[in-house]
UniProtKB/Swiss-Prot annotation:
InterPro entries: PcaF, Thiolase, Thiolase-like, Thiolase_acyl_enz_int_AS, Thiolase_AS, Thiolase_C, Thiolase_CS, Thiolase_N. PROSITE patterns: THIOLASE_1, THIOLASE_2, THIOLASE_3. The active site is at 90 (acyl-thioester intermediate), 357 (proton acceptor), 387 (proton acceptor). This is 3-oxoadipyl-CoA/3-oxo-5,6-dehydrosuberyl-CoA thiolase. It comes from Escherichia coli (strain K12). It catalyses: succinyl-CoA + acetyl-CoA = 3-oxoadipyl-CoA + CoA; 2,3-didehydroadipoyl-CoA + acetyl-CoA = 3-oxo-5,6-didehydrosuberyl-CoA + CoA. GO terms for biological process: 3,4-dihydroxybenzoate catabolic process; DNA damage response; fatty acid beta-oxidation; phenylacetate catabolic process. It is an enzyme of class 2 (transferase). Pfam families: Thiolase_C, Thiolase_N. The keyword Manganese does not apply. GO terms for molecular function: 3-oxoadipyl-CoA thiolase activity; acetyl-CoA C-acyltransferase activity; transferase activity. The lineage of its organism: Bacteria, Pseudomonadati, Pseudomonadota, Gammaproteobacteria, Enterobacterales. Disruption phenotype: Mutants are unable to use phenylacetate as a carbon source. The gene is paaJ.
Length: 401
């Protein structure tokens, strides 16, 4: 069977909500890593790219109407290169890599770019049309995160718990204490700060150059969401606003962020022809559904499924990149998979609690980080997995080349 390989990848810094990248449209943001991949790989013939596949979770504003195609054109790729946008909410970026890998394995392509983008700062407010003439019953939604235009049948059958409420549900079900969550969040901040100061994160990043109305140029080189000075005392002092006697706080949850990432996925033959060096083989991918109110546990069945497909066990994984939507759900996943809370090979360079979680981009970031870390550790296998709103999980296994 034909195999699919990650040959290169790059991402923007992750911007804080309303921060350094908030002035950049989603389509312009996605164009940045696409353009950089061509610069980094001068032998690559862009005319040979079969498709560009990007994940994006919102698609209600400037990211509407197929942001992948628009970003492809804005990046200067040939008009002959097609682009498509997929939406599996938080899992969109990882799913994009899976789509690219399946195309190669099926013989439907040899060279693709896959990744994801999200500008949560620029997510618009939306309002539906009136149900009847002259109606005064209008409802407006903030599309940054969460439900909008809810189907009443969905609400009746499955509820409309917010993302923090689903994390509260997981914490209650599995008896995950506030203390354990805050300790996990602190480790995320500490590991991320160390990775940033040592230059590990810089290996993944292309700086974003911005010019304001006065012509002043600013170069954004680093992720800006992390808080390296965080202490356990500070985390313990934060309020839990989502439920009486709750445990979910701003400190043990991921951020609302902006960012984009893109990776080159190629067959072995095309990689050689284009002067590309395979770094990781995409072994297998799986998705799974869970109860929407417990969406944070989605990585558990998805991971078990992908391990079964690959004929591997969780103990074969040298690196695990688990998206930290919330400390509660990350801990729930680790415990259900039989892993310790502080496993050194799980998110060794921190995670979304510190880095942030630009929804459509995050899965691509996980794969990029995992492929780098496998080479640093001389490991063989990596697992990338994440929970998904409305009750899903996604998981992918990579093998170092």
């Amino acid at each position: 069977m034909r195999e699919a390989f990650i040959c290169d990848g790059i991402r923007t810094p992750i911007g804080r909500y309303g921060g350094a990248l908030s002035s950049v449209r989603a389509d312009d943001l996605a164009a940045i890593p696409l353009r950089e991949l061509l610069v980094r790989n001068p032998r690559l013939d862009a005319e040979c790219i079969d498709d560009v596949i990007l994940g994006c979770a919102n698609q209600a504003g400037e990211d509407n109407r197929n942001v992948a195609r628009m970003a492809t054109l804005l990046a200067g790729l040939p008009q002959s290169v097609s682009g498509t946008t997929i939406n599996r909410l938080c899992g969109s970026g990882l799913d994009a890599l899976g789509f690219a890998a399946r195309a190669i394995k099926a013989g439907d392509g040899d060279l693709l770019i896959a990744g994801g983008v999200e500008s949560m700062s620029r997510a618009p407010f939306v309002m539906g049309k009136a149900a009847s003439a002259f109606s005064r019953q209008a409802e407006m939604f903030d599309t940054t995160i969460g439900w909008r235009f809810v189907n009443p049948l969905m609400a009746q059958q499955f509820g409309t718990d917010s993302m923090p409420e689903t994390a509260e549900n997981v914490a209650e079900l599995l008896k995950i204490s506030r203390e354990d969550q805050d300790s996990f969040a602190l480790r995320s901040q500490q590991r991320t700060a160390k990775a940033q100061s040592s230059g590990i994160l810089a290996e993944e990043i292309v700086p974003v150059v911005l010019k304001n109305k006065k012509g002043v140029v600013t170069e954004i080189q680093h992720d800006e969401h992390l808080r390296p000075e965080t202490t356990l005392e500070q985390l313990r002092g934060l309020k839990a606003p989502f439920r009486a006697n709750g445990v979910i706080t701003a400190g043990n949850a991921s951020g609302v962020n902006d960012g984009a990432a893109a990776l080159i996925i190629a067959s072995e033959q095309m990689a050689a022809a284009q002067g590309l060096t395979p770094r990781a083989r995409i072994v297998a991918m799986a998705t799974a559904g869970v109860e929407p109110r417990l969406m944070g546990l989605g990585p558990v069945p998805a991971t078990r499924r992908v391990l079964e497909r690959a004929g591997l066990s969780i103990h074969d994984m040298d690196v695990i990149e688990l998206n930290e939507a919330f400390a509660a759900q990350a801990l729930g996943v680790l415990r259900e998979l039989g892993l310790p809370d502080d496993a050194p090979h799980v998110n060794p360079n921190g995670g979304a609690i510190a880095l942030g979680h630009p929804l459509g981009m995050s899965g691509a970031r996980l794969a990029l980080a995992a492929s780098h870390e496998l080479h640093r550790r001389n490991g063989r296998y990596a697992l990338c997995t994440m929970c998904i709103g409305v009750g899903q999980g996604i998981a992918m296994i990579l093998e170092r080349v």
